[in-house]
Regions:
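C-terminal beta-signal and adjacent terminal beta-strands/loops
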Residues: 594, 664, 721-731, 754-811
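Extracytoplasmic beta-strand/coil segments of soluble accessory domains associated
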Residues: 45, 65, 74-123
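A beta-strand signature from Gram-negative outer-membrane beta-barrel systems
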Residues: 120, 134-186
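N-terminal Sec signal peptide and the immediately downstream disordered periplasmic leader
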Residues: 1-70, 74-79, 141-144, 212-217, ...
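Gram-negative outer-membrane beta-barrel transporters
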Residues: 584, 589-731
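Outer-membrane beta-barrel transmembrane domain signature of Gram-negative proteins
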Residues: 325-338, 357, 372-478, 672-705, ...
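Outer-membrane beta-barrel signature, preferentially recognizing the C-terminal barrel domain
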Residues: 274, 333-335, 450-462, 508, ...
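Transmembrane beta-barrel wall of Gram-negative outer-membrane proteins
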Residues: 181-184, 198-323, 327-347, 756
């Protein structure tokens, strides 16, 4: 594979710095240390440098450039944040449609996402087939429009006492554009152009078109405004599959063998069409108060890959597919958030009262499929299920500044009420039916539909009260203290707290540290989601595989217990340094201990299970079962380094940024097999090798990046080098066959040149992964007989080099 050398990287940086200069101009994407932050503190004048915990600030310009591939916010965050992982999925069920993200190597549901400081809802779809994020319902970052963003603040520390459940790894706060006097039109087009080594062929695919517009207007003379925006995206599919060697367990018939050497599978991004819309507004109603509202809407139709079905396999009828077929999953994703409130000042107090409604609806479909048990008359299109999650939040925040004990204190208190609702609905009857052909698999191929017995309808209320105070003791010492009481209708009460402090020993050097305890309550989907797969055994008897709710009586009899909240204890210690106006550096060490991490159990299988369920519940043919459980206690230790150097050079402004992150997760304790299962079979294991691998080393532990940005009146030149650390994949196929592969570290080089034609027009060309680098090829035991030569674990992905052009008009 291609690997960039240091000389190649050096040439790229030199090229970015050698352009002709016209005049000095501030780098549009540069984040300065005097940027005032609003995340993680009550103080209204804290800057990035003065924060008691690490906070990254990403500007709209940073995000716009980094998200040029597919117009994805998640991809932009991965490019810009070394502790953020956003792997590309393929052949991974629901994860092909809603990608999960990690912060500090932790689970996707252990990071809290805010929009304008208000809690963002999660997706409705449970990831049960992916590696990263298995068993979670993550926030869908790609449902947030890129052109709506003013900046993003990323708090890299536990913040449950300040923001509530989920903020174990940190908080990502998306601040929306509030400049009504600037409008913008933008369009871009790009595609992958790459050498696909497994097929020895150069390929151009993944053509992506993106268009956006936003416009605003002032409302009155008192600071009111209204701003609205729209994005349209269209992405064609990519494919990096290899040549099929025909698995030996398939029928070795002439029709099947005739497909050898062809590309029957797909490995890559699915086709996507999407629309994003947003608004942001405020209207003063008095000299000291204003109404505000904002919202986002996402409508996205996606496709996902699935394994090929051979012509003479039992999953096919040649009357329908004479040459075999590959089912295509379709996702219909609809996402909405709308927030309205009032804020202002009453006497010495600032207030903010709001209502926040968020909802995600996901419909899962299959086409180019069939239900083989229904015979050659089977339909080929199915709806396999509907999923919905809704969240309503009411907040009241009060803040007051006062002086006492020789210090300035910003005291905040408030209350929050949250209602969550989760529902699933069965798919088409044909998607889960067991037809008359008992020698054929049942249900729609590539995932049987939810049946009526799987349907869920859950809701709960959550109430909380909180208080925090940010204090400034002179010029050197500052603190943040927070406490929160949270009561869950289904889990009872939880207390969280946080103490953070910073001391400046000199203008150029300060120490900071924090300790906090945090909580993540089990999601409603982890509590109530169920799914059933059906089939026939060799004797033609109906069989079932069940993913069971922990409240299902069968699961209880197999050792399931009520899920407990995940609880963490977070420690951090670091320093910040600023040397003049040119150089700043921060280094932070952290430890996160998490008890009772939630995961999906391994499949419980065998005749002992089948007989037990039949005898005790009268349900026949249950050949496998699984459920969610509090699987393990973990410890994550790591460090994060960020450095910036600014200099006027070569006739323009130069910004060099270097970052490094390290996070290693180890298992402290693993749940034992319950007595109920040991009585059935002493070899049963609930939390095994594969799930241990998912928590510990399936994601890279290290990440390093070096970026250079140079600009003057007409040019903005940027280059970025990323190094992604190694990741390990482990499969447990049973019978002692446990293939393992560690995929080595990879480098990625990105370049962009942008030219300003006057004050309004901007043209740009660029490339990402321009050296066309790929991850290591998978070994034979993992590559599925040549069909899947690359793994989805590496953040560099398996698409190769991407080239693009962009035009923007501002007014």
């Amino acid at each position: 594979m291609t690997r960039p050398t240091l000389s190649a990287i050096g040439l790229a940086v030199a090229a970015a710095l050698s352009a002709n200069a016209q005049a000095q101009q501030a780098a549009p994407g540069a984040t300065t240390l005097d940027t005032v932050i609003v995340t993680g503190t009550r103080a209204s004048d804290r800057t990035v440098l003065e924060s008691t915990v690490p906070v990254d600030v990403l500007t709209a310009e940073d995000i716009r450039k980094a998200g040029v591939v597919n117009g994805e916010l998640g991809s932009a965050l991965q490019a810009l944040l070394p502790s953020f992982n956003f792997p590309r999925q393929s052949n991974s069920g629901g994860a092909d449609h809603i990608r999960a993200a990690q912060l500090r190597g932790l689970s996707p549901d252990q990071v809290l996402v805010l929009v304008n400081g208000k809690r963002r809802h999660t997706s409705a779809l449970v990831n049960t087939d992916s590696k990263i994020g298995k068993g979670t319902t993550p926030v869908d970052f790609n449902s947030i429009p890129i052109n709506a963003i003013k900046r993003i603040e990323v708090l890299r520390d536990g913040a449950g006492a300040q923001y509530g459940s989920d903020a174990i790894a940190g908080v990502i706060n998306v601040i929306l554009d509030d400049n009504p006097e600037r409008g913008e039109l933008e369009a871009s087009f790009g595609a992958y152009n790459t050498d696909v080594e497994p097929i020895n062929r150069r390929v151009t695919d993944g053509q992506t078109s993106y268009a956006s517009a936003k416009v605003g207007t002032l409302l009155g003379d008192d600071g009111g405004f209204f701003k609205v925006g729209l994005e349209l995206k269209n992405r064609e599919a990519t494919n990096r599959a290899g040549f099929d060697q025909i698995p030996p367990f398939e029928e070795q018939t002439p029709a099947n063998l005739a497909l050898a050497g062809r590309r029957n599978y797909v490995l890559g991004d699915g086709a996507t069409k999407g629309l994003n819309a947003w608004l942001n507004t405020k209207v003063p109603f008095s000299a000291n108060g204003e109404f505000y509202a904002f919202g986002t809407y996402n409508q996205r139709d996606t496709e996902g890959a699935n394994y090929f079905r051979y012509p003479d396999g039992s999953a096919n009828w040649r009357e329908i597919y004479p040459n075999g077929y590959r089912p295509i999953s379709e996702g219909e994703n609809r996402d909405l958030q709308i927030v309205a409130g009032a804020r202002g000042q009453l006497g010495d107090w600032d207030y903010d009262a709001s209502v926040n409604y968020g909802r995600n609806d996901f419909t899962y479909r299959l086409r180019n499929s069939l239900n083989a048990s229904l015979g050659p008359g089977s339909t080929t299109r199915f709806k396999t299920g509907d999923f919905a999650f809704a969240q309503t939040v009411a907040n009241l925040d009060l803040t007051r500044v006062f002086d006492a004990a020789g210090a300035t204190h910003t005291f905040g208190t408030g209350a929050e009420f949250r209602r969550e609702q989760y529902r699933t609905h069965a798919g088409d009857p044909a998607s889960y039916a067991a037809g008359p052909f008992t020698d054929r698999p049942t249900g729609s191929q590539a995932g049987g539909g939810l049946s009526p017995q799987d349907e869920a309808d859950l809701s709960r209320n959550v109430a909380s009260a909180y208080a925090n105070v940010s204090s400034q003791f002179g010029d050197k010492f500052s603190t943040d203290l927070a406490g929160r009481y949270e009561h869950y209708q289904d889990f009872g009460s939880q207390w969280t707290g946080k103490l953070a402090a910073r001391y400046a020993f000199a203008p150029a050097f300060a120490l900071r540290g924090a300790v906090s305890n945090n909580v993540r309550a089990p999601s409603l989907s982890q509590i109530g989601y169920e799914a059933t797969s059906t089939g026939y055994d060799a004797a033609g008897r109906l069989t079932q595989g069940r993913l069971l709710s922990v409240y299902n009586p069968i699961a209880r009899a197999l050792g399931a217990t009520d899920l407990k909240p995940e609880k963490s204890l977070n420690y951090s210690l670091g320093f910040t340094s600023q040397l003049g106006d040119h150089f700043d550096l921060s280094l932070d060490f952290f430890q996160i201990d998490i008890d009772d991490r939630i995961a999906l159990s391994e499949d419980i299988t065998g005749t002992a299970l089948t007989d037990f369920v039949q005898q005790n519940f009268g349900v026949s043919g249950v050949q496998s079962a699984s459920y969610f459980l509090n699987a393990a206690d973990t410890r994550t230790r790591g460090a994060e380094l960020v450095g910036n150097w600014r200099q006027y050079a070569f006739g323009g402004d130069l910004l060099l940024t270097g970052t490094y992150s390290y996070a290693k997760t180890e298992l402290k304790n693993v749940i034992g097999t319950p007595a109920q299962l040991l009585a059935l079979d002493p070899d049963y294991v609930l939390f095994g090798i594969e799930e241990s691998n998912t928590l510990t080393d399936a994601a890279p532990r290290t990440r390093a990046a070096l970026a250079a940005n140079w600009n003057n009146e007409h040019w903005n030149l940027q280059t970025r080098v990323n190094r992604y650390g190694s990741a390990t994949r482990v499969f447990d196929f049973g019978g002692g066959f446990v293939p393992r592969q560690t995929y080595g570290a990879e480098w990625q080089l990105d370049l962009e040149a942008e030219y300003h034609l006057g004050a309004q027009w901007t043209l740009a060309i660029g490339g990402q992964n321009i050296l066309d680098n790929y991850s290591d090829r998978s070994i034979d035991d993992i590559a599925y007989f040549g069909n899947l030569p690359y793994d989805v674990l590496s953040p560099i992905g398996s698409n190769g080099a991407y080239w693009y052009g962009r035009v923007r008009y501002t007014f």
